[in-house]
Curated annotation (Swiss-Prot):
ATP binds at residues 122-129. CDD domains: RecA-like_ClpX (cd19497). This is ATP-dependent Clp protease ATP-binding subunit ClpX. GO terms for molecular function: ATP binding; ATP hydrolysis activity; ATP-dependent protein folding chaperone; protein dimerization activity; unfolded protein binding; zinc ion binding. InterPro entries: AAA+_ATPase (IPR003593), ATP-dep_Clp_protease_ClpX (IPR050052), ATPase_AAA_core (IPR003959), Clp_ATPase_C (IPR019489), Clp_protease_ATP-bd_su_ClpX (IPR004487), ClpX_bact (IPR046425), P-loop_NTPase (IPR027417), Znf_CppX_C4 (IPR010603). Belongs to the ClpX chaperone family. PROSITE patterns: CLPX_ZB (PS51902).
């Protein structure tokens, strides 16, 4: 190796042994035994190694795909109830990733299609949580998009391609990683067209968005600007194959129960052959959702082509009071456990009495916000205590009972000196 160092008085001008740049042309020059390497060459080496690893990773991952039963068990740890939806999701997700890891065709040459998922359920029933938990279990990139912000290309709002850009951002613009990701599009029911008949006026945030999403969900090669695309317009666009991305669309579909009820209630036949139904034979929202058919979704405002791209439909049930109590204390990241952990950082125990849990669940049921409303109730109840506690000394325990939830009294503070008093500051 030729020595490119030059004597300059008492100091020696050093050069990178790999690219030949001097120490003044680079930010850092690392010295080894008679060898030097600059920071730019180190970055280049890292890129080369990363590319090598990327080619090896898919082979390693193929052995790690959990079975539908294992996926369901993992969902049970975080999501209460929704047994049918969990089973449907577990099978659909397993089949999707099995298809990716074994190629799109079988040994007999049979092409395997993609099964995207439609989640139908009332607000706060766990649609988003199910999608997030699946992505975390499979260790794949996950992004959420709000369908209400999407518009057709050329109009004010987000283009559908922005969804893929968000997914790329989650995995540092690694295209191969993004192509194995999961995209959850929330509020999908809000882009339904206003009537069953095609409109002659432009519907840029309804049917127009459904049309724009068609190819993306089914599978296309989307051109996405690279990181800092506007700063470096000369860079080539990244090509992302969306046929490998799993799309999960979710929505509350308010009013869909009326559409289903109307179809189910329509009796067939006349005379003795008529299907007679009692007026009192009314069904719950959850029972009606389980009877949903593609024709109901078309009547609701989704175009037939869009419904066809979402062949797997999972319906979620309304959460009753017992389920809300379970959600408060049973999952691994249950809200009561989260707040107990927060209080533990102050060296204080937090206890929720049984009657308090029932009162919280009853309050959430009245608000009709499902599990989503539980956190806001707890925040309001614990606000004063969390405000005062860091400034107080010798508090060892905080007890919450029904009267605290109903606003009739303040939380009970138990001091390490075995004294107890109400937390209300008079």
């Amino acid at each position: 190796m030729t020595d490119k160092s030059k004597e300059g008085g008492s100091s020696k001008l050093l050069y990178c042994s790999f690219c030949g740049k001097s120490q003044h042309e680079v930010r850092k020059l690392i010295a080894g035994p008679s060898v030097y390497i600059c920071d730019e060459c180190v970055d280049l080496c890292n890129d080369i190694i990363r590319e090598e690893i990327k080619d090896v990773l898919p082979k390693k991952e193929s052995a790690a795909l959990p079975t539908p039963r294992k996926i369901r068990e993992h969902l049970d740890d975080y999501v209460i109830g929704q047994e049918h939806a969990k089973k449907v999701l577990a099978v659909a997700v397993y089949n999707h990733y099995k298809r990716l890891r074994n190629g799109d065709t079988t040994s007999e040459g049979v092409e395997l299609g993609k099964s995207n998922i439609l989640l139908i359920g009332p607000t706060g029933s766990g649609k988003t949580l199910l999608a997030e938990t699946l992505a975390r279990l499979l260790d794949v990139p996950f992004t959420m998009a709000d369908a209400t912000t999407l518009t057709e290309a050329g109009y004010v709002g987000e283009d559908v391609e922005n969804i893929i850009q968000k997914l790329l951002q989650k995995c540092d613009y690694d295209v191969a990683k993004a192509e194995r990701g999961i995209v959850y599009i929330d509020e999908i029911d809000k882009i339904s067209r206003k009537s069953e008949n095609p409109s002659i006026t432009r519907d840029v945030s309804g049917e127009g968005v459904q049309q724009a999403l068609l190819k993306l969900i089914e599978g296309t090669v989307a051109s996405v600007p690279p990181q800092g695309g506007r700063k470096h317009p000369q860079q080539e666009f990244l090509q992302v194959d969306t046929s490998k991305i799993l799309f999960i669309c979710g929505g509350a579909f308010a009013g869909l129960d009326k559409v289903i009820e109307q179809r189910v209630a329509t009796g067939t036949g006349i005379g003795f052959g008529a299907d007679v139904r009692s007026k009192d034979n009314s069904k719950t929202l959850s029972e009606l959702f389980t009877q949903v058919e593609p024709e109901d979704l078309v009547k609701y405002g989704l175009i037939p082509e869009f419904i066809g791209r979402l062949p797997v439909t999972a319906t979620l049930t309304e959460l009753d009071e017992a389920a809300l109590i379970q959600i408060l204390c049973e999952p691994k990241n249950a809200l009561t456990k989260q707040y107990a952990a927060l209080f533990e950082l102050e060296n204080v125990d937090l206890e929720f009495r049984e009657d308090a849990l029932k009162a919280i669940a009853a309050k959430a049921m009245k608000r009709k916000t499902g599990a989503r409303g539980l956190r806001s109730i707890l925040e309001a109840v614990l606000l004063e205590t969390m405000y005062e506690l860091p400034s107080m000394e010798e508090v060892s325990k905080v007890v919450i009972d029904e009267s605290v939830i109903n606003g009739e009294s303040a939380p009970l503070l138990i001091y390490s000196a075995n004294e107890s008093q109400a937390a209300g500051a008079e």
